[in-house]
Amino acid sequence: MADLFERAAKFYAELQSELCRVLADADGGSEFTSDAWQRPGGGGGVARVLEGGALFEKAGVNWSSVDGELPAEIAEHMPGQGRSFRACGISLVLHPRSPMVPTTHANFRCLTKGDALWFGGGADLTPYYLFRDDAVHFHQTLATVCDRHAPIGDYDRFKAWCDEYFFLPHRGETRGVGGIFFDYLGAKGTPHPPEQMFDFVQDLGKAFVPAYLPIAQRRSTETYGDLERTWQLRRRGRYVEFNLIYDRGTLFGLKTNGRVESILMSLPPLVRWDYDVMATPGSREAELISHLRPTDWLQRAG
């Protein structure tokens, strides 16, 4: 188990380097900074952030491998004995400059506690304007990986999990058009072979670029004006609301004395809240809102 954890940590670190290389090249206007840090309780990580780019207004790709003692109220809800834990993973959020390019998030992680080891992760897409082809492409790329690793990769289940997880109850809408989400893979009734789980997670990590980058490059040439930019900033407000109120990773990090700068890296650089603003009926903004609910983008149901 210890060997698999170390291999996972190494893979996530290598994936961080590769993603930053590819994303900086795609941006063409800025580079990622690198900030290595140590956690007082044990372990550390590397935060890599690109700001003020041509394609990305802000992009962050974090890697960490930490260990320590969990608070009792968290430990009792997790698999394994005791309160000692180890966690490694990669987390990324890309906030594009153009409102025609969707924001995206992905993370892949491995945790151990007592005799339990499990994987978690996923990837999701948050557009500001709806392009159906983009949603289909993103979902199809992830579904192909899941199908290749069935039954461990269960696209239909992970997609439904994503729709449920990335939901803002106080707004009555999903954060975006979804993707996949999974947790406790290898624990809580999913006793899959560890090596096969790791193969699946590695394949997913490598699929992120082909799932997202063609969308970003295609939409970056779309024209937009002040109306679209204002809409983007308002919709970013929903992103902030979810991350600070509901996101499990954010709350876990804050409750385990995590590094605040890394935890809040996911927040966009600019955002706005305007009082009681509604999308105009029949507008492209209204079209997006109408699709912020579980949608069978690949028409696999039935």
Residue positions per predicted region:
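Internal mixed beta-strand/loop scaffold within catalytic domains of large alpha/beta enzymes
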Residues: 47-121
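Gly/Pro-rich turn-and-neighbor structural signature
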Residues: 2-79, 188-225, 229-239
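An amphipathic alpha-helical core segment
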Residues: 163-181, 217-262
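Glycine-rich, often proline-containing surface loops adjacent to acidic residues and nearby aromatics
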Residues: 59-60, 86-88, 117-126, 173-196, ...
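Short conserved micro-motifs at the rims of enzyme active sites and ligand-binding pockets
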Residues: 74-76, 134, 191-192, 251-257, ...
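TerminUS-proximal long segments
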Residues: 256-302
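Long, charged, mostly alpha-helical binding arms that flank functional sites
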Residues: 145-200, 214-217
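Compact, glycine/acidic-enriched structural inserts
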Residues: 114-158
